[in-house]
Amino acid sequence: MPKERVDVLAYKQGLFETREQAKRGVMAGLVVAVLNGERFDKPGEKIADDTELKLKGEKLKYVSRGGLKLEKALENFGISVEGKTTIDIGASTGGFTDVMLQNGAKLVYAVDVGTNQLAWKLRQDSRVVSMEQFNFRYAEKTDFEEEPSFASIDVSFISLSLILPALHRVLADQGQVVALIKPQFEAGREQIGKNGIIRDAKVHKNVIETVTEMAVAEGFSVLGLDFSPIQGGHGNIEFLAYLRKEEHASNQVVSEIEPLVEKAHREFKDE
């Protein structure tokens, strides 16, 4: 498991505006692990880079900081999930599920290939159907009692090209999708740098072009693009795509790709 300095990780996860602030914050004992509350007070200490951190005493808005990704997408793309049946593909601890519930979703299918990851408070919620050890690429309409009209996708170690065909089978016509594009799982192996990090803006641009073209081919119009407000594993920049299932799908973001990638790289240039 790759490791990262506590102060760098705290900065990357958005707890502080600068690395210097993060360093001082760690030394002051302000940074703790979300999972078990362990406190870190040595900025240079190296911990697993997938350790989720928070500020001491901070009440997280969602069960996972990852929920901030979907929150941004719903706000920026003007999507409402109120009263809808939805799917959270790659639910993990349930950050996206939590966002959907807090925004009025009627029912959420929380789907994940793993087991025992979904937060306890979500397991206990009658509006959540937990579908563990479920490989969504083989999903069929009959797997879902209610037809979903919204889906989020946040998957790792698998390309969206294996998820979208299954989602097309399951999702209602005109159903909306927020898909997290993770270049590190879409690019060719030769394009991925040390520790699984992609820093080349050209690779990001090519990945987004490929994924959006593939989405159209699978019957989804591409209506919007943005970058994730927080970085993914190992510090990778990730992107948000707004899709809609349509009979005559089209790509409406072609001209936005290059400016968006440039903007994302400016935003995270010191990471």
Predicted regions and their residues:
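S4-like RNA-binding module at protein N-termini
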Residues: 4, 20-79
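Conserved class I S-adenosyl-L-methionine
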Residues: 81-92, 100
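Glycine-rich SAM-binding Motif I of class I
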Residues: 94-95, 116
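Conserved S-adenosyl-L-methionine
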Residues: 99-107
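S-adenosyl-L-methionine
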Residues: 109-162
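A short glycine-rich, Lys/Arg-flanked "PGG" loop and its adjoining helix->strand segment in the class I
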Residues: 161-178
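Conserved beta-strand signature within the Rossmann-like core of class I S-adenosyl-L-methionine
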Residues: 174-183, 187-188
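Flexible, glycine-/basic-rich loop-and-beta segments that form/coincide
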Residues: 237-239, 243-271
